[in-house]
């Protein structure tokens, strides 16, 4: 793998997450009915950071949750082409709430579809929205993000690597040539 470009550094990532937080507040006219649900692995710390920014802006906490989808992603591995939803999902009650799924990269749409299915098994939300740090295209399902940090058109021979403090050493988004 060869590094092709650094797309976001730590400061650019913080600005991007701040913009997404503002867009979420604006589109939903506040945060009263919102539940942010991070898709494990890197969607969880991204959701936590967006929640912290929203709290700074609004002065109150947004409800947070997570969904654990074990995925042998088709852009990282060929072990399985389908995401596997574990029965360990932990999140707020979603009935009649606006659930905002948060993930690091939107690619084929399969992870998002599995997360939506997991949410629907837990209750019937008023609405489900999607926030992603990076949208790289190449959808295999009719999935579109409501909040996008950065659109990064890629070829299938490229890989987007999102690094998040807490899991990784730094905040950054890089593109690699395979």
Swiss-Prot record:
Keywords, alphabetical: Glycosyltransferase, RNA-binding, Transcription, Transcription regulation, Transcription termination, Transferase
Documented EC number(s): 2.4.2.9
Gene3D superfamilies in the cross-refs: 3.40.50.2020
GO molecular function, one term: RNA binding
Function field: Regulates transcriptional attenuation of the pyrimidine nucleotide (pyr) operon by binding in a uridine-dependent manner to specific sites on pyr mRNA. This disrupts an antiterminator hairpin in the RNA and favors formation of a downstream transcription terminator, leading to a reduced expression of downstream genes. Also displays a weak uracil phosphoribosyltransferase activity which is not physiologically significant.
Family assignment from sequence similarity: Belongs to the purine/pyrimidine phosphoribosyltransferase family. PyrR subfamily.
Subunit and partners: Homodimer and homohexamer; in equilibrium.
Protein name from the UniProt record: Bifunctional protein PyrR
């Amino acid at each position: 793998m060869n590094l092709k470009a650094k797309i976001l550094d730590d400061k650019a990532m913080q600005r991007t997450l701040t913009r997404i937080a503002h867009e979420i507040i604006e589109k939903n006219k506040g945060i009263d009915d919102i539940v942010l649900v991070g898709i494990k692995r890197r969607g969880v710390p991204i959701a936590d950071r967006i929640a912290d920014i929203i709290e700074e802006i609004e002065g109150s906490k947004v409800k947070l949750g997570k969904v654990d989808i074990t995925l042998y992603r088709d852009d990282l591995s060929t072990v399985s082409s389908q995401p596997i939803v574990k029965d360990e999902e932990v999140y707020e009650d979603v009935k009649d709430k606006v659930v905002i799924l948060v993930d690091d990269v939107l690619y084929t749409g399969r992870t998002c579809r599995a997360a939506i299915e997991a949410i629907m098994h837990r209750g019937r939300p008023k609405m489900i929205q999607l926030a992603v740090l990076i949208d790289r295209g190449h959808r295999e399902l009719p999935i579109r993000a409501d909040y996008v940090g950065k659109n990064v058109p890629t070829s299938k021979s490229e890989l987007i690597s999102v690094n998040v403090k807490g899991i990784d050493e730094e905040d950054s988004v890089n593109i690699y040539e395979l």
